């Protein structure tokens, strides 16, 4: 290892040509004046080596690398530098070979043995020592004005075992992050960091970082058989070091690349990877012990969707941990869903164009800080879902795109590689190593960060070969269809692996088409001939679009759109659904939830309250994006986040916004306490229409039923008039009804048109009828 500069290390793309002071470029011998400054005991010339040996060993012959090895090492294209460098038994003793560009002299140290090596030029040093066995040894390396005693990285055996290599070759290493990437470790009694990267098309790979002044010339990696993996153990390198891989492409050009398996990164726009070692101690054992008590579709789930960087702009993970759990718990949500946390270079992508799939974004802190946030949420009784983006990745030339000089993570067919909507690249789901990268990534977040579930983004774009493509821009699959069979197999493998490894986890699909069996088990074949995709839940995009369209119309016109509020029950039990009012619906000119509603400010709030009441009563889990819980009027912006000032008592209209927030809190309280609202979300026996055809009245009414038949009656009046004495047919075995929530209550900012308590039905022909108002 060369002397470290005082700075943390510049961007390697800008500093490849910079050399530490007093050092000479590769290929040039140190000047004579420089030699005189080297320590006298290790002074060496190109033709002789002055040696001091307590044991009496002498360098008899210089076993320098042959011309071919030398050329490949200098060019960065050697596949097995350990076979040349380090110490090796040869006829006559042990040959020592060292490649230390810019060094003036190198001495081998082993116990009392001190042997100065020949300077063979171009940074190569060698010597033959008459020893019987290869000793454990260190190197004393002299530079101009200084010298360092270091370990020889080329004396170590590979750090990856046969099982790791077998699983890597099969594409079945379910803990891939433990094999690849950068890992501080102790190897053969020496502390350092193991670097490993998959780059099968590379002619050679070196590791560069602050520890070698971003010049990887002296640190070539070895290729491990047919796996395509390159590996090197660097003694003395520890947590916190910046690094990249310097890859020689098939055409001989070089590129610096961030580690695809980096578990920590620099803060964007900087792009280096960071060696990371976690020492976090979790405190969420009780949460994990009960997480699998009930499957997600049979448990209450009310989700608060959060964009962490803008929820309270400027807060770190640890600062968020002091505020977010308390806020979410106070409002009664069962889960948060975090928009993508994995590292991404462009904040304006909201995290949906990922470059660091294994690293939480460094904008808010380090990986242990993110663990602390998850831990605090769990200890507050809140589950953590995370948006996960396996469909595509950006084209940044320091990340995954043509990683080793050829299409690697992306499909080799340009028609399959380019995503037509986002200008990104789609993963090659048919390549086993790529599939392994993604499946292991899903497992990684759930095992290492205790994430309770993944909401998989853009599933529809993965499933169809013709997604957003015109005729001629795609080719059918082997059966002549438009289904992406590779993506189907990947999603099935991901879900099956995750559910097997992580008890209590849930996966959620953002899938906007009528694909059959999104939440069906992978081993159950459907009418289309495919097994299910194996997700636990699916976003109900149809319900969202239809219901929001209905609400956007003036009440006088809603009778013409009544079916948009009832059609969801036609297919409600075809999948396990989430009802999403997500970030996508409150940006880019779509307006916030309350601003979608017609009428004046009072009517807009009344409409939003009525809509939220309908949403919480409808079969399916709920998801609400931040800011909508208090009727923010403006669209969301990642630059400034929710308008919290609307809740400030000093603001004149704050009571209006606090009223909607209080409604959301009470909706969650009633929801969690009422099994009829969630236990039979996926069973037709849990729902019964009472009034489904009153289009002229803008009225809907239905029963939700618990497993024992205990009912809850939900009544929605989407007209701007009070319907006093409105008659509804209800089961006659219920003697009285208690109104648990009315969205028009004064405390929510409504007109306080509520029902008496209790409401007693009036018998009529074997069926009770109750009078309702509101």
From Swiss-Prot:
Q: Where is the composition biased (Basic residues)?
A: 29-40
Q: Which domain of life is it from?
A: Bacteria
Enzyme kind, highest EC tier: transferase
What biological-process terms (Gene Ontology) are attached?
glycogen biosynthetic process
Annotated GO MF terms: 1,4-alpha-glucan branching enzyme activity; cation binding; hydrolase activity, hydrolyzing O-glycosyl compounds
Its pathway? Glycan biosynthesis; glycogen biosynthesis
**EC number(s) on file:** 2.4.1.18
- SMART domains named in the record: Aamy
Keywords carried by this UniProt record: Carbohydrate metabolism, Glycogen biosynthesis, Glycogen metabolism, Glycosyltransferase, Transferase
Q: Name one Pfam family in it.
A: CBM_48
Gene Ontology cellular-component terms listed? cytoplasm; cytosol
The residues annotated as the active site are 457 (nucleophile), 510 (proton donor)
Q: What is its biological role?
A: Catalyzes the formation of the alpha-1,6-glucosidic linkages in glycogen by scission of a 1,4-alpha-linked oligosaccharide from growing alpha-1,4-glucan chains and the subsequent attachment of the oligosaccharide to the alpha-1,6 position.
| Annotated PANTHER family | 1,4-ALPHA-GLUCAN-BRANCHING ENZYME (PTHR43651:SF3)
Please give the HAMAP family that the UniProt record associates with this protein. GlgB (MF_00685)
State the name under which the record lists this protein: 1,4-alpha-glucan branching enzyme GlgB 1
Which species does this protein come from? Streptomyces coelicolor (strain ATCC BAA-471 / A3(2) / M145)
- Taxonomy of the source species: Bacteria, Bacillati, Actinomycetota, Actinomycetes, Kitasatosporales
What gene does this protein come from?
A: glgB1
């Amino acid at each position: 290892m060369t002397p470290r500069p005082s700075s943390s290390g510049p961007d390697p793309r800008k500093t490849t040509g910079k050399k530490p002071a007093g050092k000479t470029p590769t290929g040039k011998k140190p000047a004579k004046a420089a030699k005189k400054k080297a320590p006298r005991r290790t002074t060496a010339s190109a033709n002789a080596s002055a040696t001091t040996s307590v044991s009496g060993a002498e360098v008899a012959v210089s076993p320098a690398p042959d011309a071919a090895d030398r050329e490949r090492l200098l060019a960065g294209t050697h596949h097995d530098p350990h076979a040349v460098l380090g110490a090796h038994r040869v006829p006559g003793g042990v040959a020592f070979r060292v490649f230390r560009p810019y060094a003036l002299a190198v001495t081998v140290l082993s116990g009392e043995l001190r042997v100065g090596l020949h300077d063979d030029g171009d940074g190569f040093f060698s010597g033959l020592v008459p020893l019987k066995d290869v000793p454990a040894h260190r190197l004393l390396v002299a530079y101009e004005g200084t010298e360092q005693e270091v370990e020889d990285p080329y004396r170590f055996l590979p750090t990856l075992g046969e099982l790791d290599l077998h699983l890597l070759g099969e594409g079945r290493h379910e803990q891939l992050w433990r094999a690849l990437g950068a890992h501080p470790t102790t190897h053969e009694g020496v502390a350092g960091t193991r670097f490993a990267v998959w780059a099968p098309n590379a002619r050679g790979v070196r590791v560069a970082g602050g520890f070698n002044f971003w010049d990887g010339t002296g640190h070539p990696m070895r290729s491990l058989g047919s796996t395509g993996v390159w590996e090197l153990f660097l003694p003395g390198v520890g947590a916190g070091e910046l690094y990249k891989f310097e890859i020689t492409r098939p055409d001989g050009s070089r590129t610096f690349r961030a580690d695809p398996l980096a578990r920590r990164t620099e803060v964007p726009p900087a792009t280096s990877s960071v060696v990371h070692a976690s020492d976090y101690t979790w405190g969420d054992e009780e949460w994990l012990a009960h997480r699998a008590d009930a499957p997600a579709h049979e448990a209450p789930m009310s989700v608060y969707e959060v964009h962490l960087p803008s929820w309270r702009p400027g807060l770190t993970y640890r600062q968020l941990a002091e505020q977010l759990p308390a806020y979410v718990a106070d409002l009664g949500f069962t889960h948060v869903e975090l928009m993508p946390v994995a590292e991404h270079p462009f904040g304006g992508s909201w995290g949906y164009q990922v470059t660091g799939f294994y690293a939480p974004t460094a904008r808010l802190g380090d990986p242990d800080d993110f663990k602390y946030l998850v831990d605090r949420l769990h200890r507050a009784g809140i589950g953590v879902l995370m948006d996960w983006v396996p469909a595509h990745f950006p084209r940044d030339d320091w990340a995954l795109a043509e990683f080793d000089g050829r299409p690697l993570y992306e499909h080799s067919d340009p028609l399959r590689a380019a995503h037509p909507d986002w200008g990104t690249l789609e993963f090659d789901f048919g390549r086993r190593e790529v599939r392994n990268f993604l499946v292991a990534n899903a497992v990684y977040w759930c095992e290492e960060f205790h994430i309770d579930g993944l909401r998989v983004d853009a599933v529809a774009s993965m499933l169809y070969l013709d997604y957003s493509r015109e005729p001629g821009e795609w080719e059918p699959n082997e059966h002549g269809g438009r289904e992406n069979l590779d993506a189907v197999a990947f999603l099935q493998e991901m879900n099956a692996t995750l559910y097997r490894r992580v008890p209590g986890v849930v996966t959620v699909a953002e899938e906007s088409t009528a694909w059959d069996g999104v939440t069906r088990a992978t081993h159950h074949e459907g009418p289309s001939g495919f097994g299910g995709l194996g997700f636990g839940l699916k976003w109900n995009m149809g319900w969202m679009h239809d219901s929001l369209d209905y609400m956007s119309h003036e009440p006088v016109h809603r009778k013409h759109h009544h079916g948009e509020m009832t059609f969801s029950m036609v297919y409600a039990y075809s999948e396990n659904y989430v009802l999403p009012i997500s970030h996508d619906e409150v940006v880019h000119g779509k307006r916030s939830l309350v601003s979608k509603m017609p009428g004046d400010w009072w009517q807009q709030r009344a409409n939003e309250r009525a809509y939220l009441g309908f949403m919480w009563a409808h079969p399916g889990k709920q998801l609400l994006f931040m800011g909508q819980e208090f009727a923010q009027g403006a669209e969301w912006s990642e630059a400034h986040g929710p308008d919290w000032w609307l809740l400030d008592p000093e603001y004149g209209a704050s009571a209006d916004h606090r009223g909607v927030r209080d409604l959301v809190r009470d909706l969650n309280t009633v929801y969690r306490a009422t099994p009829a609202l969630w236990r039979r979300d996926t069973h037709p026996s849990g729902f019964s229409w009472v009034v489904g055809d009153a289009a002229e009245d803008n009225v809907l009414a239905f029963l939700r039923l618990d497993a024992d038949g205990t009912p809850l009656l939900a009544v929605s009046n989407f007209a701007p008039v009070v319907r006093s004495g409105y008659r509804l047919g209800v089961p006659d075995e219920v003697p009285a009804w208690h109104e648990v929530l009315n969205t028009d209550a004064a405390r929510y900012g409504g007109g306080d048109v509520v029902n008496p308590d209790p409401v007693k039905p009036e018998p009529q022909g074997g069926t009770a009828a109750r009078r309702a108002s509101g």
